[in-house]
Amino acid sequence: MSEPKEEFNKHNYSADSIQALEGMEHVRMRPSMYIGDVGVRGLHHLVYEVVDNSIDEALAGHCNNITVIINEDNSITTEDDGRGIPVDLHKKEGVSALEVVMTKIGAGGKFDKDSYKVSGGLHGVGVSCVNALSDHLKATVYRNGEIWEQEYERGKALYPVKKVGDTDKRGTIVTFKPDASIFTQTLEYSYDTLASRLRELAYLNKGITVHLIDKRHVKEDGEFEGETFHSEEGLKEFITYLDATREPLMKDVIAFEGEKNGVPVEVAMVYNTSYAENLHSYVNNINTHEGGTHLSGFRRGLTHTLKKYADESGLLDKLKFDIAGDDFREGLTAIVSVKVQEPQFEGQTKTKLGNREVSASVSQAVSEMLTDYLEEHPDDAKTIIQKVILAAQARHAAQKARDMVQRKTVMSIGGLPGKLSDCSEQDPTKCEVFLVEGDSAGGTAKQGRDRAFQAILPLRGKILNVEKAMTHKVFENEEIKNIFTALGVTIGTEEDSKALNLSKLRYHKVVIMCDADIDGSHIATLILTFFFRYMKELIENGHIYIATPPLYLVKRGAKKRYAWSDQERDAIIAEFGDGAKIQRYKGLGEMNAEQLWDTTMNPEFRTMRLVQIDNGTEADRIFSMLMGDEVPPRREFIEKNAVYANIDA
């Protein structure tokens, strides 16, 4: 390899900055230890690991543009205009620093504080892990006027790093194709999933520009499908995006950006007319959906500042009961983003920040920001406190309703809902319950099920839209009370009186089974909204499924076949030839018990969709848009996403 030109600066990003921490031998054997899983999430996580390198360059002030391309063969190309990965000889390893970065787990400048003060990446395994799990990877570096490249197969270099030309560009290009022998579930990248994360990164790192290009799809104008994400105001714009479908209570988004006790803190918040609390927190661009010290600091700063203002203004004088911390957060959408040099992650999924020093930094930032805003906007301040008082009154009503749910749920088996047809199996891990719309479909499901391990809970019509309902109305609703009771779920644990208690969960599979039509989809969405807002842990723990009943039965003589789509139906008709008869199932009740078992309930042949939350922030926005009060955003979403949509004016 020819000797590369070297460039010197105070904190020189060179081979000496690269520290190799661990070998790669276990990555291919135990990929889930490194990227979480080898399903859809793990596949997309590969992209995030590579993009995180570019984001680190941006955080260090050396990168402005990042491009992600989904190629026609579902390989991925990422490109940035950062300094380029160092290519000079690594003294300890005896090969190019680029090869060290690409083939040693944990190798990278992010472990060297002079190169990167903070670094993204939850697993922190870096691009070498992506290399190990790729069938093929090519790295191209533009650095100091020269172009360098190296290719790899399944993590092993095919040849030494070599110079292939000169350039006036700078940056790094990585193209990789995930290994089909590891990612056996799918190799298909979701545009929406990648767009959601890249949009999030653009908001969290204002000023950088992120391009997403999908070469699998060409638009009518001949250009590839794609989007560009860029934000000049960062979290303020992020809040506006998330709350676009909610009615604001304030003129402006309250925002703070600065450093407190050595911790860079960004906060943005706004109140709206909804009854939900929507707090989103990030550490070094990682979505910490389990919360942590930064979120507890935010809550403490918010509660202390608002209560102090309300007391000093005499706005709480007539209140006959105490205000709780929750009351200050009803109808609040907020984002907390901190940058921490050495984050300590805890919790079930390692997404809970444990650094104690961060709490005081965030609390101080929120107190200063909020105090200034309340003094400058007295009308908004009064509106917020009035909202808090209403929330407190509703909380008292909701507590009574919650207690009713609690009492009803912890009763003996005789207290189960009358319409529940239970199963005989006592082991919850082997049991499943089908939530079925209507008594007629419920009757068919009861006849068709395997009584040993399948229970049926019929629901009466469309359940309450919890997105528009006050909390006490939710807990007073009979159908929702029946769901709590049937599932054995209660509210309150030893650690948290308001947390969901799943210790007595009676079924480990909860299956939403609705008609395969528009009404059925609406009912399924209402049920999903309830689970997302009030039983999110069931989704996060992989307990919620959606059944997929067939749309058609195609017959010709003695031959019959079910179809789950129009395309499948047409293919069967073409195969059967003339004389094929088609039956369209508008509802579950149109199938007899044997057909329902064969197509939708039999574990050997059925297809069920596991409900997962890929991006909690985006999921929150979409539920709010689909089920909230604002009609125009919902209409726009349907028109953009529906294959066909008959929307009443």
Region locations from a protein language model:
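GHKL-family ATPase ATP-binding module
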Residues: 1-17, 24, 48, 56-58, ...
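Conserved short strand/loop->alpha-helix "switch" segment adjacent to the catalytic nucleotide/phosphoryl-transfer site
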Residues: 29-48
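Residues immediately C-terminal
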Residues: 56-57, 84-85, 518-519
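Conserved ATPase-coupling elements of RecA-like P-loop NTPase cores
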Residues: 60-62, 87-90, 446, 523
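Short conserved segment of the HATPase_c
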Residues: 85-107
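C-terminal interaction appendages of subunits in large macromolecular complexes
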Residues: 393-412, 427-432, 443, 447-449, ...
